[in-house]
Amino acid sequence: IAEIQAAIVALRQYQPVVAVIAGSVGCFGGMSIAAALCSYLIMTQEGRLGLNGPQVIEQEAGVQEYDSKDRPFIWSITGGQQRAASGLVDAYVEDDRQQIKQQVLQYLTQGLPDLHRSSNYDFYLNHLQGVDTTEQATPLQVRTLYQGEQA
């Protein structure tokens, strides 16, 4: 996975690298880091994005902390609609091949972003420092965490 991540960083200097997170499998672990390194992220309703998957979090923290079978809760935290509303992805589209293709082509035509998300780490670190980790975050808290000026 590290080689994939290095290739993304090398390629994005020259042209946009677009990640699509669709379907019900989700994008977790090292591949979520690879996705975050891309120039643009596109997600669908069924897509999920997070550093750890629901089952891993449940295994480590317990079902009281994170119930991996509670699908509405999982999507309310890591789903495509939530990630788009949180500003962590660039586009939220229907899980439709033509819509996904159209969005990918739009980003390729648009060119490189002014600032890649992964280069803006100070913004994210500053916001994360204010998070109360003693309580389970609500979907609304997740949505509002990164709102505001990002560059």
Protein language model regions, located:
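Intrinsically disordered, low-complexity segments enriched in small/flexible residues
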Residues: L105-A151
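Conserved catalytic cores of soluble enzyme domains
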Residues: I1-D114
